[in-house]
């Protein structure tokens, strides 16, 4: 039962406000002794020209409902105190009946392409790529839970001037045998060396540009090298995606749109939107805005041209209701321009394009940069995380049967959870030892809580009945109330494209359950044993589902 909705329904019978407005106004009192929900009468005071405290008193006197132990006016608020036993009973019934579908909703429908991860070919996946990958993956899972059809697109950086640089670098310093032995490490080494040498000899940049131009013009040798670099890189990326448990519906990268850009340029020209500026072709976006660069002075294409082609292709291919781009905050200007150009072209659906920005991962307070080579490789981080998890499992539970698999789930899950528990826009510092701890605000803490719940259920070894699931103690109520909040948490996370809402919720539910575990003798044989076990089972169901929405596995033993 949705107790907040019950409050909305009761208040709406007494006041002349739409239910949506009432729902937005309802608050949670900071002091639990004041009740569980509060309706403020300030909005009505403006309409009725009456003291809000008198309005609150009037409403409270007219409402009664046996789902609440008290409904009373406190100053300008109407406070509602839920009947604890009824909330516990109703919530446990809902969770145990709906199982992993608890929290499923129909908030929308239709295709939602999500442009995410998108690493550059021939460079190792770094911690920077982790953010776009796991944020996009979690948003996809959450949108699916509320009715949409997500389409995960890995818009590979498999084209662009960097390939001219890489081809030049490979010809100068490369060697086929080394690349075959360890493709990514060596290709990346050539790329870094190119930038180091180009700082001393700027002519190298011209050579790189010339090589890219040959690639664009279909030079056979250049294309052969480019295809090889792409193939060996993709094999490496897919190995890491498998570790993370992330899959994609499309790998159409930048190169896929090579033959789709000219029609965009032609359309811009036909619609009179292209202007010349210092030899380049641009779309003017108004006095206060920088123009959108479409073609360089040498006629070669730019990111904007390609992204316009991609946006038009995705609309035609998927007829999307929303299109999301999970990319760093530094690209905000680019996506703003993309929407503005599409709008000028007459495509009103551009309003449904959303950039989902995120902050930086730092290490020791320093930004990670590929070009300078001071980059933290994601592959190594995941290996180290699994190794740390393995050490802790060895200490805590040396007889665990499937140690390797659990260490993988805990180590990789710890890295993913740590990323997602931070507000999407926040920058955060990454310290692996903190991340993989079994205590504190970590993924392993949530996983361990779920494993603890599973252990209790194994010990009890009882079939849980749906009869009489009422519990009256404060510890049970705190857990059940948190469980009851899960659908609203899912809704909020999906609307704000904010996985941290789910991660913070999972931590909060874990803390409440662990307090319950410390204060209640769960396995005592009495007439409330069944209800207590139902609470344990419901907690495990919701924790497992919350972790799934974050892309984290929930081992049953740890």
UniProtKB/Swiss-Prot annotation:
Disulfide bond positions: none
Compartments in which it is found: Cytoplasm
Gene3D superfamilies associated with the record: Arginyl tRNA synthetase N-terminal domain, HUPs, Isoleucyl-tRNA Synthetase, Domain 1
GO annotations of cellular component type: cytoplasm
A molecular function GO annotation: ATP binding
Main location: cytoplasm
Protein name: Arginine--tRNA ligase
Naturally occurring in which organism (per UniProt): Lactobacillus johnsonii (strain CNCM I-12250 / La1 / NCC 533)
């Amino acid at each position: 039962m949705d107790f907040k909705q019950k409050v909305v329904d009761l208040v709406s019978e007494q006041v002349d406000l739409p239910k949506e407005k009432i729902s937005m106004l309802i608050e949670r009192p900071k002091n639990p002794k004041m009740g569980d929900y509060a309706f403020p009468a300030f909005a009505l005071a403006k309409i009725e020209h009456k003291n809000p405290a008198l309005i609150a008193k009037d409403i409270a006197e007219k409402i009664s409902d046996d789902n609440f132990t008290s409904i009373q006016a406190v100053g300008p608020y109407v406070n509602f105190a839920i009947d604890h036993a009824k909330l516990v009973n109703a919530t446990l019934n809902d969770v145990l009946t709906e199982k992993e579908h608890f929290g499923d909703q129909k908030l929308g429908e239709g295709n939602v392409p999500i442009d995410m991860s998108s690493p550059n070919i021939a460079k190792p996946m770094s911690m920077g790529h982790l953010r776009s990958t796991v944020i996009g993956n979690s948003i996809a899972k959450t949108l699916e839970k509320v009715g949409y059809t997500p389409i995960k697109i890995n818009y590979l950086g498999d084209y662009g001037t960097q390939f001219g640089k890489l081809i030049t670098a490979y010809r100068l310093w490369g060697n086929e045998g080394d690349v075959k032995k360890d493709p990514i490490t060596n290709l990346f080494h050539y790329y870094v060396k190119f930038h180091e040498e180009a700082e001393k000899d700027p002519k190298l940049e011209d050579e790189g540009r010339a090589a890219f131009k040959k690639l664009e013009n279909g030079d056979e040798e250049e294309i052969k090298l480019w295809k090889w670099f792409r193939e060996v890189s993709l094999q490496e990326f897919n190995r890491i995606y498998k570790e993370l448990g992330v899959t994609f519906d499309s790998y159409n990268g930048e190169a896929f749109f090579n033959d789709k850009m000219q029609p965009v340029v032609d359309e811009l020209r036909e619609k009179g939107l292209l202007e010349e500026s210092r030899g380049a072709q641009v779309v003017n976006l108004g006095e206060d805005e920088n123009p959108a660069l479409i073609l360089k002075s040498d006629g070669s294409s730019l990111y904007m041209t390609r992204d316009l082609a991609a946006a038009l292709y995705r609309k035609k291919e998927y007829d999307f209701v929303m299109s999301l781009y999970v990319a760093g905050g530094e690209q905000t200007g680019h996506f703003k321009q993309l929407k503005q150009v599409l709008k000028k072209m007459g495509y009103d659906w551009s309003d449904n394009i959303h950039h989902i920005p995120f902050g930086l991962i730092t290490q020791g307070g320093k930004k990670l940069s590929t070009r300078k080579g001071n980059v933290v490789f994601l592959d190594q981080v995941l290996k180290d995380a699994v190794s740390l998890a393995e050490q802790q499992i060895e200490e805590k539970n040396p007889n665990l049967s499937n140690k390797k698999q659990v260490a993988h789930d805990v180590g990789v899950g710890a890295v993913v959870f740590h990323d997602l528990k931070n507000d999407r826009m926040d920058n955060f510092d990454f310290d692996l030892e903190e991340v993989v701890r079994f205590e504190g605000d970590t993924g392993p803490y949530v996983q361990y809580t779920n494993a603890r719940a599973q252990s209790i259920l194994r010990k009890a070894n009882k079939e849980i009945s749906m009869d009489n699931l009422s519990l009256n103690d404060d510890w049970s109520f705190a857990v059940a109330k948190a469980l009851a909040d899960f659908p609203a948490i899912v809704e909020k996370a999906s609307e704000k494209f904010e996985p941290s809402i789910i991660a913070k919720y999972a931590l909060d539910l874990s803390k409440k359950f662990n307090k319950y575990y410390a204060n209640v003798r769960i396995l005592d044989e009495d007439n409330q044993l069944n209800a207590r076990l139902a609470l344990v089972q419901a907690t495990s169901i919701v924790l497992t589902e919350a972790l799934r929405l974050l892309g984290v596995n929930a081992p049953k033993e740890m």
